[in-house]
């Protein structure tokens, strides 16, 4: 293939360039368009161009060269390009070619000068913006600098074009074309200058009209709508600025008014936008970007080009949605604040209910998983771990006991209790007590022991118990199924029922506690009384309790098979307007059997004694969790009725055999006060005595219960001994009066001892065995499911 071109004074002959490039891999060749400009063709790849076998090349500008008739051959590539100087004596063939290509010559000459200039010149010729036009899109600081450089290049080119037009006037036939181009350039992508139109002629005019009609076909139709839209937008922005709110559009939208230059740069652009006469021109807002902006940024792709022309519609739609949202918000603001508060409270209530439901479901699922894991376990050591893990779970979440019972936990535990491993048996007894499963009572019915509060006067109750032990020849914890105490009675209940201490040791310990605690200086006690409302040191009392009882929990005492059910009573003073009784138990209630009294078994033993003995004026009130505890004697100094209720919850089908109520002595004065008035001290004493009265409960129970069921032992003292008495002679006096009272009521004591010594009948033993097997195998043994 051969190409013969006659351009001005030089001709270039390229013989079979495809073969040469493919074989010799030529890198570049130089093409001289004029004696002062040199262009080089750089080989890129063997791609298809206009001709199916033509090599695509890239044209780049190089330095100026002068060429004559010679052969330019790139080194080591073998590409020969013939360059011949033409003259009037040129061959005929070349003259014909020159005549035929005259029109192509003129067209290519104008195209080469207009198109193949520098990048800034090309951009300036394609993007002759009006001084008042602005492109609304986000740019960085470097982008603004680039725009400023482009504007400077435009100004320099304008000056150059003005000078060139003065030197070479435009023909008259082209004047109307230039005027028409100036009018169209205000609203077109291509902005015509005199230099370009003069050189291009009709070809450039046709090309520019085609591009402008393609890219800006709908601009005139939507211009009015866009102007009205952006006018509304500016009004909305003004309102938001007044309200102190900042509005910003989506960063993905190129044509956004939210991103504006700083005041300095905006001031500079306003100065530059003024007309030569000094009057500022109006700045119409254009939502579309011209093709020159995308040519100046070669890294941007087709998506940016398309987005620049359709992006003008997005802000309008976005602002319409915002205006609708604002219209909907206006009636909502007019609603009263009370309804909003109600909705907020309802939402909080619903969220709390949802959280509770989710928590309850998770607790139930965890309980089921632990029970099923225990039922699948056969190894005794692993069973101990499973049982203890389930015990801790139920202590933390008592509401899971019902699910555990439904999952047939009790039969599994009863079968495990038959194993000979003592550790496993102790763990099983603890979790059975926690669930509320109890063994049958020891005697023919329920046997209850209750001890009143009274400080160191509790030695009187010890004298009564000593006589019962002497008559029955059994320790206290074997005589009774349930032991309950208040204040000092709780101390005796724990020592006798939980620690199984002998009576002599209990009396010695009782005297020592009295001397250690109640030996307080009067002056120091008075100061403490005014400061903490406690005459004695509560911290010392807590320290003694921790040393004696340790950190064991109440429920852990159920591991001992000989341990009866034990409870200590305190009074909660911060729940509601009236005090409420609180029961510290070493057992739990079976699911479905609800007690009327508050309480729990997850507390430590020393905490139960500390709360139950917090007598006002003697010891400071004790805070345990969210509750504030005081002495239980403030509400129930005689806990017999409470003990009966608790026993009925534990053994609902068992009869009540015996209730032994032990008092700490009472004092009855024969002195009569004035009948006209009473002193303030007397009034306060009457209130306290009525609150701590034990005889009214005794009278009521004695009249309601069957004969030989309720036995009350409370001796009358010849002297009113205070609660904090620690002198040994006074304590000896109390013991002596207690012994005299027992001697006077020896017949009554023998009756109680006889009832407590009765054994179960054969029929009761058979019933207990059947019940145990039924619970163990979920039915009668011969109808068992296993």
From Swiss-Prot:
Residues 225-245 have a biased composition (Basic and acidic residues). GO terms for cellular component: endoplasmic reticulum membrane; membrane; mitochondrial membrane; mitochondrion; peroxisomal membrane; peroxisome. A motif (GXGXXG) lies at residues 453-458. A motif (DGA/G) lies at residues 631-633. GO terms for molecular function: calcium-independent phospholipase A2 activity; lysophospholipase activity; phospholipase A1 activity. CDD domains: Pat_PNPLA8 (cd07211). Pathway: Phospholipid metabolism. The keyword Mitochondrion applies. Residues 449-644 form the PNPLA domain. It catalyses: a 1,2-diacyl-sn-glycero-3-phosphocholine + H2O = a 1-acyl-sn-glycero-3-phosphocholine + a fatty acid + H(+); a 1,2-diacyl-sn-glycero-3-phosphocholine + H2O = a 2-acyl-sn-glycero-3-phosphocholine + a fatty acid + H(+); a 1,2-diacyl-sn-glycero-3-phosphoethanolamine + H2O = a 1-acyl-sn-glycero-3-phosphoethanolamine + a fatty acid + H(+); a 1-O-(1Z-alkenyl)-2-acyl-sn-glycero-3-phosphocholine + H2O = a 1-O-(1Z-alkenyl)-sn-glycero-3-phosphocholine + a fatty acid + H(+). A motif (GXSXG) lies at residues 485-489. GO terms for biological process: arachidonate metabolic process; cardiolipin metabolic process; lipid catabolic process; lipid homeostasis; triglyceride homeostasis. Residues 158-180, 225-285, 321-348 are annotated as: Disordered. The chain crosses the membrane at residues 483-503. It is a single-pass membrane protein. The active site is at residues 487, 631. Expressed in kidney, heart and brain. This is Calcium-independent phospholipase A2-gamma. The gene is PNPLA8.
């Amino acid at each position: 293939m051969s190409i013969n071109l006659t351009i001005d004074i030089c001709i270039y002959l390229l013989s079979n360039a495809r073969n040469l490039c493919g074989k010799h891999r030529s890198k570049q060749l130089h093409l001289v368009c004029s004696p002062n400009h040199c262009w080089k063709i750089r080989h890129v790849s063997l791609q298809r161009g206009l001709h199916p076998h033509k090599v695509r090349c890239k044209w780049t500008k190089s330095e100026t060269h002068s060429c004559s008739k010679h052969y330019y051959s790139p080194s080591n590539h073998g590409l020969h390009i013939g360059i011949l100087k033409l003259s009037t004596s040129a061959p005929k063939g070349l003259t014909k070619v020159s005549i035929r290509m005259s029109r192509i010559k003129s067209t290519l000459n104008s195209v080469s000068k207009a198109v193949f200039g520098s990048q800034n010149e090309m951009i300036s010729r394609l993007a002759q913006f009006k001084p008042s036009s602005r492109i609304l899109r986000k740019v960085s600081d470097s982008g603004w600098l680039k725009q400023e450089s482009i504007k400077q290049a435009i100004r320099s080119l304008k000056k150059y074009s003005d000078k060139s037009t003065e030197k070479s006037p435009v023909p008259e036939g082209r004047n109307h074309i230039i005027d028409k181009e100036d009018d169209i350039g205000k609203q077109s992508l291509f902005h015509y200058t005199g230099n370009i139109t003069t050189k291009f002629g009709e070809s450039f005019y046709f090309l520019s009209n085609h591009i402008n009609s393609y890219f800006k076909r709908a601009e005139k139709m939507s211009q009015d709508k866009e102007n009205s839209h952006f006018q509304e937008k500016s009004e909305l922005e003004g309102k938001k600025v007044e309200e102190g709110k900042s509005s910003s559009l989506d960063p993905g939208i190129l044509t956004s008014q939210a991103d504006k230059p700083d005041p300095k740069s905006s001031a500079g652009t306003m100065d530059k936008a003024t007309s030569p006469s000094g009057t500022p021109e109006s700045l119409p807002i254009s939502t579309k970007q011209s093709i020159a902006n995308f040519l100046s940024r070669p890294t941007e792709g087709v998506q940016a080009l398309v987005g620049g022309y359709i992006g003008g519609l997005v802000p309008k739609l976005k602002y319409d949605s915002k205006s609708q949202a604002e219209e909907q918000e206006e009636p909502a603001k007019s609603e009263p604040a009370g309804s909003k508060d109600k909705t907020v409270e309802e939402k909080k209530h619903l969220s709390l209910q949802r959280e509770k439901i989710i928590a309850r479901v998770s607790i139930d699922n965890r309980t089921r998983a632990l029970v099923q894991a225990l039922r699948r376990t056969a190894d005794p050591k692993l069973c101990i771990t499973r049982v203890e893990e389930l015990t801790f779970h139920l202590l933390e979440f008592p509401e899971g006991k019902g699910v555990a019972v439904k999952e047939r936990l009790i039969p599994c535990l009863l079968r495990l209790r038959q194993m000979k491993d003592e550790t496993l048996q102790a763990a099983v007894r603890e979790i059975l007590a926690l669930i509320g499963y109890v063994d049958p009572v020891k005697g023919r019915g329920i046997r209850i022991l209750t001890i009143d509060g009274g400080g160191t006067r509790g030695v009187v109750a010890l004298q009564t118990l000593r006589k019962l032990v002497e008559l029955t020849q059994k320790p206290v914890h074997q005589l009774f199924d349930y032991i309950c105490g208040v204040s000092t009675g709780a101390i005796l209940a724990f020592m006798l029922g939980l620690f199984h201490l002998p009576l002599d040791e209990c009396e010695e310990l009782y005297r020592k506690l009295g001397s250690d605690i109640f030996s307080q200086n009067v002056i120091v006690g008075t100061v403490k009384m005014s400061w903490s409302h406690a005459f004695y040191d509560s911290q010392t009392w807590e320290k003694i309790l921790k040393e004696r009882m340790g950190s064991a929990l109440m429920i852990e005492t159920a591991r001992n098979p000989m341990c009866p059910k034990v409870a200590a009573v305190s009074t909660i003073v911060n729940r509601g307007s009236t005090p409420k009784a609180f029961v510290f138990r070493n057992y739990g209630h079976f699911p479905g059997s609800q007690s009327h009294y508050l309480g729990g078994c997850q507390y430590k033993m020393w905490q139960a004694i500390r709360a139950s003995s917090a007598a006002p004026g003697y010891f400071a009130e004790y805070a345990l969790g969210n509750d504030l505890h005081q002495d239980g004697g403030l509400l129930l100094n005689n806990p017999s009725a409470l003990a009966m209720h608790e026993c009925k919850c534990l053994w609902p089908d068992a009869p009540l055999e015996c209730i032994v109520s032990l008092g700490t002595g009472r004092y009855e004065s024969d002195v009569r006060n004035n009948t006209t008035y009473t002193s303030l001290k007397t009034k306060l004493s009457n209130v306290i005595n009525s609150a701590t009265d034990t005889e009214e409960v005794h009278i009521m129970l004695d009249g309601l219960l069957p004969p030989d069921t309720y036995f009350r032992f409370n001796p009358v003292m010849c002297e009113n001994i205070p609660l904090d008495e620690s002198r040994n002679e006074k304590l000896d006096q109390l013991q002596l009066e207690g012994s005299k009272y027992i001697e006077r009521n020896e017949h009554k004591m023998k009756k109680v001892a006889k009832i407590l010594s009765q054994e179960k009948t054969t029929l009761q033993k058979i019933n207990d065995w059947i019940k145990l097997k039924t619970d163990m195998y979920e039915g009668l043994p011969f109808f068992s499911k296993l």
